[in-house]
Amino acid sequence: MSSSSSTGYSKNNAAHIKQENTLRQRESSSISVSEELSSADERDAEDFSKEKPAAQSSLLRLESVVMPVIFTALALFTRMYKIGINNHVVWDEAHFGKFGSYYLRHEFYHDVHPPLGKMLVGLSGYLAGYNGSWDFPSGEIYPDYLDYVKMRLFNASFSALCVPLAYFTAKAIGFSLPTVWLMTVLVLFENSYSTLGRFILLDSMLLFFTVASFFSFVMFHNQRSKPFSRKWWKWLLITGISLGCTISVKMVGLFIITMVGIYTVIDLWTFLADKSMSWKTYINHWLARIFGLIIVPFCIFLLCFKIHFDLLSHSGTGDANMPSLFQARLVGSDVGQGPRDIALGSSVVSIKNQALGGSLLHSHIQTYPDGSNQQQVTCYGYKDANNEWFFNRERGLPSWSENETDIEYLKPGTSYRLVHKSTGRNLHTHPVAAPVSKTQWEVSGYGDNVVGDNKDNWVIEIMDQRGDEDPEKLHTLTTSFRIKNLEMGCYLAQTGNSLPEWGFRQQEVVCMKNPFKRDKRTWWNIETHENERLPPRPEDFQYPKTNFLKDFIHLNLAMMATNNALVPDPDKFDYLASSAWQWPTLNVGLRLCGWGDDNPKYFLLGTPASTWASSVAVLAFMATVVILLIRWQRQYVDLRNPSNWNVFLMGGFYPLLAWGLHYMPFVIMSRVTYVHHYLPALYFALIILAYCFDAGLQKWSRSKCGRIMRFVLYAGFMALVIGCFWYFSPISFGMEGPSSNFRYLNWFSTWDIADKQEA
């Protein structure tokens, strides 16, 4: 290496060391938000003068109070203007309004999302004086007794509050004042946020808690020079609470949690290189973050499900997704209402698998397309007549007859045939590979009372008896048992795998070879029992309570299974669905309601100016990161100023990471996707766009001419965003009259704002 290169390297290295030392010594700010954001205000003063006279400082303090109020007022207007002109159930209000009704009726239901957002919908109904008696049928007119406007206003407040949070986030990052205003304007005048914010949906709640999580995360980062101080603990705990609320609305909250987790790992890894830090302090950093960023969010998540279970105390549409004992304790449930002991022949039962996510043993007339080509046997998560079975005597003995008067109770260790009530087929297995789990045997419906073989015979093995009833009998709900094939020696089991489309994506049932004894996939219980010949259940009989944590895990697994089943149907065209690449490019939008001339119409589409610009900014910032890495490898040190480095991290790098975490999963996932899935990722793209303005135009503030040009660019782009929002405002505020009146908004053939035949 030449002497000049060597000298350059040593200077750059010294500058890098100096930068690290400066970063360690950098102080954060005081407890109030306005004071904690003062570093951004100090940076703003450079736009005007190197000196900071008292009058200018007063103006900045006044700005930090007045502008958030103005921006919030504008946000309330853009989210709530004409919010009630469409008195029909719009888009997914049909789902989430109905779920809110279930909370007011206390009826148990099942959905793919965690409960916090839907409980807030229920709260909005309660505050609006609604009694929960309506089920929000899609497209129907709201009844007079339901104040849907108040419910929508409640939801819109979450969307509106994202705007002041964006303002404070920009200040916390350290953006200059023009950039703070720009970022706030980008969020304020975003058509997609304004459109979805006015309906009874979860998206605005999800966005609010996501924005709150990132804001509190940045504020916590700004306290890094004062670890374990009151402000440090405050923002750590607020971050944890915000993360817990985000994931409690939708599982998409895992993405922002992952971003904070990556930051935390990098932070702790950096501390490990600090020889001045004692091991005790280092371990305390670990413990504090485990508590604040793992335990606190998990407790929030857990608490939401506890409230969910406590509120939904009555039987409802989602009962079958839960364990049998859980269902039995729901008010009005028919589970466990039958006689206590199971009898041969006369007892018609449904049989529930006890694995996490277990379903009811089921069969139907459709046959396997391969293998034996016999009748399918599956597990099904919903109540159905095809879930009903009865026990008959083993093959070779006389079949049970309705003329028999003596009651013969089922006993463990005895061999029986299990007969499907509606088709008369015997539960059967044979040495044929199962359709999905090829190492296990297929289970089918085969034969009848005449046709069959010894592979129809199954032995009941009791594994657990809850209660003090006769241990030698099979009891409804409280007896856990295994079902062993006498001939093959394998056990009836639900694998957890879903069958293909020919099996209606129901759960696979197999005969499992050599399972371990505690494998709950082979454990079953009687869920419902009908038998008029037996005495009813004693009135004073009480089922044992279920374990909350087990119910919590069971429900979450059922939610994941339902979510994974939301895959596109190749035989059907879903005109509402879209691909991830179409979102940042605005290739498509989404009609949110019927397109008749008589009703106001809404079209979900981002503000073109900001969405396209943010997409370009993401690509530009990616290229910038690559260039900086190449220069760093060649011993060049950029971003020497600690303030610039901090803005780069909080305003560019971590928003890019958050954007990727919120966007890329939808690129690779197999489930059906829609335009609104991009809304959280769009927020981080807007932050990156603001950073590109801030960093790209920073040097222009050094001269008077540069400051003028900088002002023109900021003002011009903000005017473009506002103008674009207003131009497309009908898609957010409601398009009244024929859609042909708005065909001027159809910039591209893929936008179906106006009907194609009218365009």
Swiss-Prot record:
InterPro entries: GlyclTrfase_39-like, Glyco_trans_39/83, MIR_dom_sf, MIR_motif, PMT_4TMC. The modification N-acetylserine is found at S2. It is a multi-pass membrane protein. GO terms for biological process: ERAD pathway; fungal-type cell wall biogenesis; protein exit from endoplasmic reticulum; protein O-linked glycosylation; protein O-linked mannosylation; regulation of endoplasmic reticulum unfolded protein response. Residues 17-27, 40-50 have a biased composition (Basic and acidic residues). Its EC number is 2.4.1.109. The chain crosses the membrane at residues 65-85, 168-188, 199-219, 252-272, 290-310, 610-630, 648-668, 677-697, 711-731. The keyword Repeat applies. Residues 1-50 are annotated as: Disordered. The lineage of its organism: Eukaryota, Fungi, Dikarya, Ascomycota, Saccharomycotina. The gene is PMT2. It comes from Saccharomyces cerevisiae (strain ATCC 204508 / S288c) (Baker's yeast). This is Dolichyl-phosphate-mannose--protein mannosyltransferase 2. One of its GO terms (cellular component) is endoplasmic reticulum membrane.
